[in-house]
């Protein structure tokens, strides 16, 4: 991937997230409920819950909302019937797409996901058809101007697996997804606050899209992300703004 688009894509992602904060809160509440139901309500001993709570804080969700979601999850009320289902498929020019959902009605969800794929030029794949093209990792992105040497030393000491600098000067740190919270805490303790910090499915190879193909691909991704049951959408497509 060209370095010039890395930072631009992250900033675009953050702006888009801010624009639909209400929807993000709804998704986070579902994730918090499920995490608490499966692993208990103590974030210090439940990595999945800790990650969801951290995301909620980053999204400026009130703490009372977070606490209520945890209590509902532990109590087995709302969220008790949510099922995690992953769908895989292809976008424009065969770009790989992973769609993670939390649903209480898998028939409804698969129909909506399939419809979005077919309506906007993609198609559903089978289980495992594209997941092998991605790595499950913790990812941090730091703004251009961050001290590369100091960050690299802190990151490697914290247990990160890889530190790389993009052409635009932004710095990316990768770690095992299970070590995400520990690495995040260590980096912040060392004075490094990431612009983006998440557990993600990172594509092993990325494909840039421009012009009409970029517009078509963005419409497909937006259609998938706007579905109520969808939690995350991952792709190896990079939309280059011209």
UniProtKB/Swiss-Prot annotation:
GO BP terms: regulation of DNA-templated transcription
Keyword flag Transferase: no
Gene Ontology CC: one annotated term: cytosol
Keyword Zinc: no
Subcellular location: Cytoplasm
Record GO terms (molecular function): DNA binding
Keywords of this entry: Cytoplasm, DNA-binding, Transcription, Transcription regulation
PANTHER family xrefs: TRANSCRIPTIONAL REGULATORY PROTEIN YEBC-RELATED, TRANSLATIONAL ACTIVATOR OF CYTOCHROME C OXIDASE 1
NCBIfam families in the record: PRK00110.1, PRK12378.1, YebC/PmpR family DNA-binding transcriptional regulator
Family, as annotated: Belongs to the TACO1 family.
Protein name: Probable transcriptional regulatory protein Bcep1808_2379
Record organism: Burkholderia vietnamiensis (strain G4 / LMG 22486) (Burkholderia cepacia (strain R1808))
Lineage summary: Bacteria, Pseudomonadati, Pseudomonadota, Betaproteobacteria, Burkholderiales
């Amino acid at each position: 991937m060209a370095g010039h688009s890395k930072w631009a894509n992250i900033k675009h992602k953050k702006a888009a997230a801010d624009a639909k904060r209400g929807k993000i809160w709804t998704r986070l509440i579902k994730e918090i409920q499920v995490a608490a139901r499966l692993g208990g309500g103590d974030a210090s001993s439940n990595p999945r819950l800790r990650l969801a709570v951290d995301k909620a804080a980053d999204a400026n969700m009130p703490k009372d909302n977070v606490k209520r979601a945890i209590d509902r999850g532990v109590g087995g009320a709302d969220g008790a019937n949510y099922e995690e289902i992953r769908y895989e498929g292809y976008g424009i020019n065969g770009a790989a797409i992973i769609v993670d959902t939390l649903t209480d009605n898998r028939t409804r969800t698969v129909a909506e996901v399939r419809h979005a794929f077919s309506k906007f030029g993609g198609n559903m794949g089978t289980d495992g058809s594209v997941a092998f093209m991605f790595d499950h990792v913790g990812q941090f992105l730091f703004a251009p101007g961050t001290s590369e040497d100091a960050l690299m030393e802190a990151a490697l000491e914290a247990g990160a697996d890889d530190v790389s600098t993009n052409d635009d000067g932004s710095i990316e740190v990768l770690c095992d997804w299970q070590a995400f919270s520990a690495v995040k805490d260590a980096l912040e303790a060392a004075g490094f606050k990431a612009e983006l910090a998440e557990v993600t499915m990172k594509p092993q190879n990325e494909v840039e899209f421009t012009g009409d193909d970029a517009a078509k691909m963005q419409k497909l991704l937006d259609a998938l992300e706007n579905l109520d049951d969808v939690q995350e959408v991952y792709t190896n497509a990079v939309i280059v703004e011209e």
